[in-house]
Amino acid sequence: MKKTVLREYAKLIAKVGANVQKGQEVFIQAELDQPEFVAMVVDECYKLKAKKVVVDWSYQPLTKLHVRYRSLKTLSTLDNYEEARWQHYVDTIPCRIYLISEDPDGLRGVNQEKMARSQQAKYPIIKGYRDQIENKYQWCIAAVPGEKWAKKLFPELRASQAVEKLWEAILKTSRVTDDPIQAWEEHNKDLHDRCEYLNSLHIRELRYKSSNGTDFTVGMIPEAQFCGGGETSLQGIFFNPNIPTEECFISPMRGVAEGIVYATKPLSYQGQLIDGFWIRFHEGKAVEWHAEQNNELLTKLIEMDEGSRYLGECALVPFDSPINQTGFLFYNTLFDENACCHLALGMGFADTIRDFQNKSLGDCRKLGVNDSMIHEDFMIGSADLSIDAVCDGGKVVPIFRNGTWAF
């Protein structure tokens, strides 16, 4: 891929995605296989007058070794220097950039029970810090084609060809055009206009139906609103958290969901794929589920904590979205969640509550926003998915027909 094009992508991530501010610290998380592109992003952050840019490198084989050889006690311990870093985030409110490129199968064979228990043990400590910075900082997740990820999508190609083809797909769906910034301004306006219409309906519940067996109803929080595209932090800074994005999303009412949903794409979770699964909800809670592939891992996900059994997000994405039109299954949630409609288990978003700026996080949760240590999207969109909105007064308004917008 031409370096001039990659430079435009790096600029898009730093300026439009994270919207790095003068004097702000930046923390970047990336895989070891992307040093050249990471350097471009770091350069763009400094051009935006970042105070300091720190890169935290990760490597899946090392994660597997840590889980294999360290005791559960040491894996479950948050050392003083790790807590100090979280306190630093609270004190300085840096922006965060996540450059994802990992192998979808990179953690196959790892002890999932050990990983889950260590995460559960550390979460109560991390949560205290995370709650203090909720909605205060900018963040952006964007993708870079790792070789093993690319080969997963295109096994028939040589590694270099597979990487190039994945680059093309990432850049196209991320709107890296002749003028990416203008393209994103137009895209954000379209998503904003759709959210405005949805919010004008005063929706009480959404009803989903598809020929694959999905028959599901979920309740809305009266004070909630649909959001999409860019967001504004509590510091007043506009940013785009996901590159790419195609969704209009809302956090539903905790405890109000009935019926069954069938996943239409595999879920990449903890370096493994969960496929062919369905989940049944009663009184908002996942009460029954099954996966043809990695059912045990699906169970670990749903049983991670009390909140992981409940929904944190309902996202509306047309089945003919640019990502779905590529014809690829990306084996990556950032892309696959923006290919079609999805739900998310776990944590809801406080910023979907109207006037959240003047409410505490606790206030938002009392209104019905779910709390959990996880937030995992799974795709339920299909070519014949219908969604109806039941609005105040009982009026029924079609939202989706044949998998796409009905308005």
Locate each region found by the language model.
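Extended hydrophobic packing segments that form well-structured cores
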Residues: 362-407
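Active-site lining segments that contact anionic ligands and/or coordinate catalytic metals
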Residues: 256-258, 274-276, 283, 309-313, ...
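Short polybasic amphipathic segments
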Residues: 205-208, 277, 287, 383-392
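Long, well-ordered mid-to-C-terminal structural blocks that present hydrophobic/aromatic surfaces
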Residues: 250-306
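Short linear motifs in exposed loops
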Residues: 219, 289-290, 400
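Dual-mode signal for accessory low-complexity, basic/Gly-rich regions
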Residues: 286-357
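Active-site bordering "gate/hinge" segments
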Residues: 1-258, 389, 395, 405-407
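Short solvent-exposed loop/turn micro-motifs enriched in small/polar/acidic residues
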Residues: 11, 199-201, 270-272, 307, ...
